[in-house]
Amino acid sequence: MAVPGPTARAGARPRLDLQLVQRFVRIQKVFFPSWSSQNVLMFMTLLCVTLLEQLVIYQVGLIPSQYYGVLGNKDLDGFKALTLLAVTLIVLNSTLKSFDQFTCNLLYVSWRKDLTEHLHHLYFRARVYYTLNVLRDDIDNPDQRISQDVERFCRQLSSVTSKLIISPFTLTYYTYQCFQSTGWLGPVSIFGYFIVGTMVNKTLMGPIVTKLVQQEKLEGDFRFKHMQIRVNAEPAAFYRAGLVEHMRTDRRLQRLLQTQRELMSRELWLYIGINTFDYLGSILSYVVIAIPIFSGVYGDLSPTELSTLVSKNAFVCIYLISCFTQLIDLSTTLSDVAGYTHRIGELQEALLDMSRKSQDCEALGESEWDLDKTPGCPTTEPSDTAFLLDRVSILAPSSDKPLIKDLSLKICEGQSLLITGNTGTGKTSLLRVLGGLWEGMKGSVQMLADFGPHGVLFLPQKPFFTDGTLREQVIYPLKEIYPDSGSADDERIVRFLELAGLSSLVARTGGLDQQVDWNWYDVLSPGEMQRLSFARLFYLQPKYAVLDEATSALTEEAESELYRIGQQLGMTFISVGHRPSLEKFHSWVLRLHGGGSWELTRIKLE
């Protein structure tokens, strides 16, 4: 096989199972890499704040029973002191609750940062992003999973964190208090009530997780459709394709909305279960209190003392039930968290797997050249051979159809190669193999020169421009960013822009370092984009330039001028093209005839 073919999209249905737990734990390792990490410190701070908050809440909860006492005894001084205490506790509780929410928000930001950067590290390693987006189809919308799903996952998880971490402490304490007030009957009844509620809600949550994963996939597909129209607005306009694209976009919208309706229908039953257990809990608390009262346990108390006791015991039982119902109420949020856990975990597993495979060829990966250095002296001894191919065969992806069979080739310095052939004969496929994006079915491919300045540089068929200034487009993919005041490299960049026929572009952009708010693809014509790619090529000055129809939008005169400048800069070309005018800049021509056959001949210049 030339490349790993697209994997069938047939994964197991996302469920509340061991796989979910494993994926969740793997994500938590990203959040909490060590005991000394910042997130652990914030988590422990949140735990302390919530513990203090619960202590204050307990004292606030006892205030009503104390009011019964002072009002029943008509104690004015006690009433004033109790009111002052109540106001103080309420202000303290409000402050602690605000710090609770603030810390949760900080955790959300920190978690999102750590998880996104972790996925970015895996996604941009070697050419994982290419494999995931082009050669595999089992992971839908990786961009949505990294940008949107991670955000929602971290926000939802942070919103329930304080409730989850305090639950073991509150449940233990209020269970003990409930036992002291009602005996074993109260805790047993409440725990049994919670177990039943948990089992019912787990049954109701299962279908929601599956449907949520499906909804997020369709959300990504719908967003991608709009992005497709945005990127290709001009071709669509030339085709007068508004009506058909309207229909296709609405079709994706209807699929999304239908899934959302199904999700809401399943959530309806979960909401019914949650609300039912909420209201039943309030009745259960009084049933638990009533049993010892009617059985005569408190028969020796006066009405005022009994009211005080009932108020205190009611608070304890109601709060214990409230702790359980809060956990049940989190079912909807936790089902969302489970759905996002599956989507993010699935992506993380795929990225980790591909990253491990890429480590074996890391020396041939993105570390091939220093992205931080400007063009200068090569760090290794220059090689007079760029590529060495020995009996290489290439297949089309997911096909047994051979594109090229048993190709042996040596591309040396000063011996430029022109690759020609009809559409579909494997010209670009050969460049993908040379660049390491694809693997040959058999044979060996060696790249003996480094990537980058004084090595090999590829100009793909579709020009690529990132966001940023004009300078950043020219020096791309070098990472060094110059100050706004300019640099010693300004003259070189301007000169290469002039040589590429883009002398007016500096004025149009307002300078090399002027931030622009446009999309470069929207403001540059196809010819200008190819000229800007050549300005980048001139700036980086590789020894070998691999060009995939890099002048197809230019005239023959402009094409000849750009190739002539490249020759003057000492470049050896490996070009894909159709024009006979290209032959004078090359020493050899490789003609691909399709079906695997090819012909390599030396160009005889007149």
Curated annotation (Swiss-Prot):
<dbReference type="GO" id="GO:0015420">
    <property type="term" value="F:ABC-type vitamin B12 transporter activity"/>
</dbReference>
<dbReference type="InterPro" id="IPR003593">
    <property type="entry name" value="AAA+_ATPase"/>
</dbReference>
<dbReference type="Pfam" id="PF06472">
    <property type="entry name" value="ABC_membrane_2"/>
</dbReference>
<keyword id="KW-0458">Lysosome</keyword>
<dbReference type="GO" id="GO:0015889">
    <property type="term" value="P:cobalamin transport"/>
</dbReference>
<dbReference type="GO" id="GO:0042802">
    <property type="term" value="F:identical protein binding"/>
</dbReference>
<feature type="transmembrane region" description="Helical">
    <location>
        <begin position="314"/>
        <end position="334"/>
    </location>
</feature>
<comment type="similarity">
    <text>Belongs to the ABC transporter superfamily. ABCD family. Peroxisomal fatty acyl CoA transporter (TC 3.A.1.203) subfamily.</text>
</comment>
<dbReference type="InterPro" id="IPR050835">
    <property type="entry name" value="ABC_transporter_sub-D"/>
</dbReference>
<feature type="transmembrane region" description="Helical">
    <location>
        <begin position="279"/>
        <end position="299"/>
    </location>
</feature>
<feature type="domain" description="ABC transporter">
    <location>
        <begin position="389"/>
        <end position="603"/>
    </location>
</feature>
<dbReference type="InterPro" id="IPR011527">
    <property type="entry name" value="ABC1_TM_dom"/>
</dbReference>
<keyword id="KW-0472">Membrane</keyword>
<dbReference type="Pfam" id="PF00005">
    <property type="entry name" value="ABC_tran"/>
</dbReference>
<dbReference type="InterPro" id="IPR036640">
    <property type="entry name" value="ABC1_TM_sf"/>
</dbReference>
<keyword id="KW-1133">Transmembrane helix</keyword>
<keyword id="KW-0813">Transport</keyword>
<dbReference type="GO" id="GO:0005765">
    <property type="term" value="C:lysosomal membrane"/>
</dbReference>
<feature type="transmembrane region" description="Helical">
    <location>
        <begin position="190"/>
        <end position="210"/>
    </location>
</feature>
<keyword id="KW-0547">Nucleotide-binding</keyword>
<feature type="transmembrane region" description="Helical">
    <location>
        <begin position="43"/>
        <end position="63"/>
    </location>
</feature>
<protein>
    <recommendedName>
        <fullName>Lysosomal cobalamin transporter ABCD4</fullName>
        <ecNumber>7.6.2.8</ecNumber>
    </recommendedName>
</protein>
<dbReference type="InterPro" id="IPR027417">
    <property type="entry name" value="P-loop_NTPase"/>
</dbReference>
<keyword id="KW-0067">ATP-binding</keyword>
<comment type="function">
    <text>Lysosomal membrane protein that transports cobalamin (Vitamin B12) from the lysosomal lumen to the cytosol in an ATP-dependent manner. Targeted by LMBRD1 lysosomal chaperone from the endoplasmic reticulum to the lysosomal membrane. Then forms a complex with lysosomal chaperone LMBRD1 and cytosolic MMACHC to transport cobalamin across the lysosomal membrane.</text>
</comment>
<comment type="subunit">
    <text>Homodimer or heterodimer. Interacts with LMBRD1; this interaction induces the translocation of ABCD4 from the ER to the lysosome membrane. Interacts with LMBRD1 and MMACHC; this interaction ensures the transport of cobalamin from the lysosome to the cytosol.</text>
</comment>
<keyword id="KW-0256">Endoplasmic reticulum</keyword>
<keyword id="KW-0812">Transmembrane</keyword>
<dbReference type="GO" id="GO:1990830">
    <property type="term" value="P:cellular response to leukemia inhibitory factor"/>
</dbReference>
<dbReference type="GO" id="GO:0005789">
    <property type="term" value="C:endoplasmic reticulum membrane"/>
</dbReference>
<dbReference type="GO" id="GO:0005524">
    <property type="term" value="F:ATP binding"/>
</dbReference>
<dbReference type="InterPro" id="IPR003439">
    <property type="entry name" value="ABC_transporter-like_ATP-bd"/>
</dbReference>
<dbReference type="GO" id="GO:0009235">
    <property type="term" value="P:cobalamin metabolic process"/>
</dbReference>
<feature type="transmembrane region" description="Helical">
    <location>
        <begin position="76"/>
        <end position="96"/>
    </location>
</feature>
<dbReference type="InterPro" id="IPR017871">
    <property type="entry name" value="ABC_transporter-like_CS"/>
</dbReference>
<keyword id="KW-1278">Translocase</keyword>
<feature type="binding site">
    <location>
        <begin position="421"/>
        <end position="428"/>
    </location>
    <ligand>
        <name>ATP</name>
    </ligand>
</feature>
<feature type="domain" description="ABC transmembrane type-1">
    <location>
        <begin position="39"/>
        <end position="332"/>
    </location>
</feature>
<dbReference type="GO" id="GO:0016887">
    <property type="term" value="F:ATP hydrolysis activity"/>
</dbReference>
